[in-house]
């Protein structure tokens, strides 16, 4: 039987991760619009075709960024699952090479996938990919203290709390405090 190459960079039992493409715009924007109640006030992903195009272009072209879509795998005939449906996204921003070899993660689940463990699996795959083929050493997540879901996801993937940064990021019209969570390649070994 011939080997068929996967369209995913990494796969788990229920999801695979792949890079963003311009062709993902319509589904991504539709998922963002469906998920506004879930995302607010923490997250403001692009919700128009033009905003998605600019966002995807940065993730595709900028070497200091890497964007990954977390996609549901086919759950089998009659399951009601759509093969390849986008469940969420994980971006590695501010990638620094040289002696630092690090990046900062940002992520979001979409409403239809929330609470099903798909983002836990997807984030774990991205971390493995970052420490494997990307050869990074450290990843950091900055989460607002009240964002219990984001903090729980970071903790469940082995990130440790390293500190607190007052007025760190400008979000929704104000400077917001953040907790800093990190993981290193040695912690995952």
Predicted regions and their residues:
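Acyl-donor (CoA/ACP) binding surface of acyl/acetyltransferases
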Residues: 1-27, 31-35, 71-189
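Generic, well-ordered alpha-helical segments
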Residues: 20, 31, 44-51, 62
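Short helix-loop boundary/capping segments at the starts of domains
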Residues: 34-37, 61
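Conserved GNAT-fold acetyl-CoA-binding loop/helix
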Residues: 37-57
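Short, charged/polar low-complexity linear motifs in solvent-exposed/disordered segments
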Residues: 45-47, 57-59, 104-106, 179-180
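A short helix-loop-beta-strand connector motif used in the catalytic cores of GNAT acetyltransferases and
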Residues: 57-69
